[in-house]
Amino acid sequence: VAVGKNYADHAAEMGGVVPDEPIIFLKPNTSVIGPGDTIVWPSIAPTIDYEAELAIVIGRVCKEVPKERVNDVIFGYTLANDVTCRELQKRDGQWTRAKGFDTFCPLGPWIETDFIPGNQRISLTLNGEVKQDAHLSDMIFKVPEIINFVSSVMTLLPGDVIITGTPAGIGPMPEKSTVAISIEGLGQLTNKVSARV
């Protein structure tokens, strides 16, 4: 499960307004890869963008979780890259194809069970150059609101992942580039991009 437009600066750069409630969409489990794996650039995609995100890993079956009880259902946290073909996103009017290709959801490097989201820095570098730099406190909807909202729609299962939105600074990843996402306390997720297939 993914949350869109959850940082005001990113909503602005996409030409949108800050939403009144979380905007959610789904990425297939076949989009998931691990740290060090290669992001495959599909031939249909003119460009592919990076999006640094905090990921929540669910630890138990849950439905309609009250905000004050979300910690009871969280197994831990990790990092995510919500890889996106921006042209397909604009063309389709919804996000499934643009964000659903195989390898379009790198996760890792590990799951941290003692992490508490607060004001930690979230950043992304592309070939060593900083492209995104913000703090988790900049999220519009925080973890309790996200889990409460998502679980009001669907039953969540152990191992489900919720990625929580990206800050401003999104942009394309060139062929054979290296993208690295960091969140203080969660380590670094690094992946390479293939040549366009």
Please identify what each model-predicted range represents.
Residues 10, 16-18, 86-197:
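Catalytic-pocket segment enriched in acidic/His residues
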Residues 52-54:
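Ligand-binding beta-strand-loop-alpha-helix segment within the catalytic cores
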Residues 59-61, 110-111:
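A structural micro-motif recognizing beta-strand termini
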Residues 63-77:
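N-terminal accessory regions of nucleic-acid-interacting proteins
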